[in-house]
Amino acid sequence: MKYILLIYNEEKAWANLTEAQGRQLMGEYMQFTKEIQENGNYNAGSQLQPTASATAVRVRDGKRLVTDGPFAETREQLGGYYLIDAKDLDEAISIASRIPSAKTGTIEVRPLVQTGAPATA
């Protein structure tokens, strides 16, 4: 089954890392990504640009509304994702718990709707 692992963390915490801390964290991410690639779990993944680069699009009463930045102000911002294959939720949670940012932020684990299968609540 496919799951998306949404990585939330405080952007300020990332911005305040020293160069050495940033290199170490990127090394941890590279190692984690290599492991899930070798295990056959990896489908895709990427770090996102900061929320200041985001554009929110909504359509209300037939009119397109475009605003800069994130829609909601929250303590943690969406900073990246992994799209993985896992046999079940337990395996997806196990993989999510190994993401380096799980130590300082939140990893949201969500199953994808399988093509041809109804969504479950």
Regions found by a protein language model. Name each.
Residues 1-121:
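Conserved, structured core segments of small domains
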